[in-house]
Amino acid sequence: MTLEQLAEHAPAGDLILQMDIEGAEYRVLTSLSDSLLRRFRIIVIEFHELDQMFSRFGHLTMRGTFDRLLDTHAVVHIHPNNNTPAVERHGLSVPPLMEFTFYRRDSFERADHIPQDAVQGLDFNCVPEKPPLPLPECWIQKAA
């Protein structure tokens, strides 16, 4: 059963999408119709294999997925999963697994700024025995 088929049975109006599907999120998100994507006011997804952005195929796949999401939604929070160590390439630190929260742009007035302290203290390590993975500064957009 596809997400499109599931949504056919949902009541009219906004939906929330939460996904942790072990790397299949890219295929699912690029296959969604524009109308269904716009129905999701909130989207929470754990993206896998983010360290593959350094390969040509990985970059093209991820770029297409994120460009599509960012047309209609804004990133409001990112939580690195500390289960796997970050990968360092070209001076960039990339946690291979990160949970992103998106909010549909037409649902709030200022899509250019979400205070980072709005969720401070709400994140917990996915693996308590391992040290946390900080989100590198380059992944955080500062409001002007």
Label the predicted regions.
Residues 1-2, 20:
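Conserved acidic residues
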Residues 2-13, 49-144:
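Rossmann-like AdoMet/SAM-dependent catalytic core
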Residues 3, 25-27:
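Short, well-ordered alpha-helical microsegments
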Residues 15, 27-64:
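A short alpha/beta connector and helix-capping loop motif
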Residues 17-24:
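Switch II (G3) loop of P-loop NTPases
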